[in-house]
């Protein structure tokens, strides 16, 4: 039985990836902060249904000895490094912790693998935010990086570290450059979930206004459940390589609002207000991915529609809010 170790297992991607690997017969391990183990009902809500099937280890990406200890205990065949400070807006507020956690954390994991388990296959969670101020549309594996946030910068550094350990030390170390991917398990701080959650609140009469930043920002949104399948395919490919994973379609925040409110029988114009304070210091105006390489080489497929993704998220939040109101 193969063993997989996931950092960031309590997050959106970690939960879907855990489900996928369990279905494939893996022994799944995850690294979590000790505070999560002490408060699982709140901090591990995405993987609550999996707790009997996975094994969790207390550890911190900011501590090399901590990471070393976990890897020595688990000895994984595959490592999926998903953990990071991933909220772009927050990276402008706290650059130091974003850079420290995301860059040093990645370096620690790679260094531990090189020292203790060089045969383990390593996956790094890259991001479309690495492209930032785009040089071409759509963006593919050859598009130059021009990050516009500390988060984007940290992901470029992680990508370069991963490539360096592959080329310099012979590790099977790969990156998936994933464009925005959402689901009902998305964090409440992200704009897509902020929209769908507030739609549910408005529908139940709990709030009357939703403040958002740049409504014209355009993103390539896909479903996280399909994107974790790509992660596994990248790791299982015969040769270590990097791949862009995306839907290939771009929609604006305004379009997301329109689809979300419309599904609930509402007009977004009646509730959404633009707040200039929510604009980023350096905006990323448009991101569109070209995943042709992944489709051709890995056979990865994405067939969901933008509308179905939005409606799934709204429907889940409407159910969540209905249960909350009843309680």
What are these regions (language model features)?
Residues 1-181, 225, 235, 304, ...:
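N-terminal Rossmann-like NAD(P)+-binding domain of SDR-like oxidoreductases, especially those catalyzing
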Residues 23, 30-31, 59, 186-195, ...:
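C-terminal substrate-binding subdomain of Rossmann-fold SDR/epimerase-dehydratase oxidoreductases
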């Amino acid at each position: 039985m193969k063993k997989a170790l996931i950092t960031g297992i309590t997050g959106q991607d970690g939960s879907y990836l855990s489900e996928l690997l369990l279905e494939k017969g893996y022994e799944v391990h995850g690294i979590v902060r000790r505070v999560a183990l002490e408060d699982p009902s709140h901090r591990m809500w995405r993987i609550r249904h999996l707790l009997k099937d996975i094994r969790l280890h207390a550890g911190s990406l900011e501590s090399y000895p901590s990471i070393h200890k976990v890897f020595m205990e688990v000895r994984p065949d595959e490592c999926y490094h998903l953990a990071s400070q991933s909220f772009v807006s927050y990276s402008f507020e706290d650059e130091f912790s974003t850079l420290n956690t995301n860059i040093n954390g990645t370096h620690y994991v790679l260094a531990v693998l090189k020292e203790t388990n060089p045969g383990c296959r390593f996956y790094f969670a890259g991001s479309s935010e690495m492209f930032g101020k785009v040089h071409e549309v759509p963006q593919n594996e050859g598009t130059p990086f021009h990050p516009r946030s500390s988060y984007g910068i940290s992901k470029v550094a992680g990508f370069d570290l991963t490539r360096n350990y592959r080329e310099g030390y012979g590790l099977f170390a790969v990156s998936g450059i994933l464009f925005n991917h959402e689901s009902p398990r998305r964090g409440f701080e992200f704009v897509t979930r902020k929209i769908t959650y507030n739609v549910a609140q408005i529908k139940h009469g709990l709030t009357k206004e939703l403040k958002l930043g740049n409504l014209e920002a355009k993103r390539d949104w896909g479903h996280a459940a399909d994107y974790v399948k790509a992660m596994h395919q990248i790791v299982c490919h015969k040769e270590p390589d990097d791949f862009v994973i995306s839907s290939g379609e771009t929609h604006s925040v305004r379009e997301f609002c329109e689809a979300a409110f419309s599904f609930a029988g509402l007009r977004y114009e009646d509730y959404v207000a633009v707040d200039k304070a929510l604009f980023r210091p350096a905006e990323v105006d448009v991101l569109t991915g070209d995943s042709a390489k992944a489709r051709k080489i890995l056979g990865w497929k994405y067939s969901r529609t933008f509308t179905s993704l939005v409606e799934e998220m709204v429907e889940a939040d409407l159910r969540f809010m209905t249960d909350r109101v009843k309680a």
